[in-house]
């Protein structure tokens, strides 16, 4: 159980490399439990992520910006592609989603990582439940490209 992404214990991370990088993941959210959230995040000293949350049996695309959660839209189906694009020179990140892995839709505003966490900037996958224990989040594949 965790209240926010930063408190989640279920994370798998990759240190950011290069000046320009893109991380993309295929998320199968068919087995989420109520209160569960799963997705893709990017962190420096702030934790920002995009993912799916299940609330009262319904699935929502949502953004989490350093603990503040914003529902974007209700989604149907079982799978979604999530992407984060990073520009280290400009200290800028952007989050995207797609249902076909071709047409990615910008989700939320670009933001700065505010580097400062001792681990450095990282991208990663996460899953946590705000109500208790339970549910599953399947990450089919993860791709990380950088220059």
Place the predicted regions along the sequence by residue.
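Extracellular glycan-recognition regions
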Residues: 1-147
């Amino acid at each position: 159980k965790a209240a926010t992404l930063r408190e989640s214990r279920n994370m798998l991370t990759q240190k950011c490399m290069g000046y320009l990088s893109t991380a993309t993941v295929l998320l199968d959210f068919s087995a989420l439990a109520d209160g569960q959230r799963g997705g893709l995040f990017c962190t420096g000293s702030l934790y920002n992520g995009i993912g799916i949350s299940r609330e009262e049996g319904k699935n929502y695309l949502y953004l989490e910006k350093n603990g503040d959660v914003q529902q974007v839209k209700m989604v149907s189906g079982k799978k979604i592609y999530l992407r984060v694009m990073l520009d280290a020179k400009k200290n800028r990140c952007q989050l995207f989603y797609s249902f076909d892995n071709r047409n990615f839709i910008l989700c939320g505003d670009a933001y700065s990582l505010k580097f400062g966490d001792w681990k450095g900037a990282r991208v990663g996958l996460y899953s946590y439940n705000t109500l208790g224990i339970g549910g599953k989040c399947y990450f089919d594949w993860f791709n990380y490209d950088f220059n």
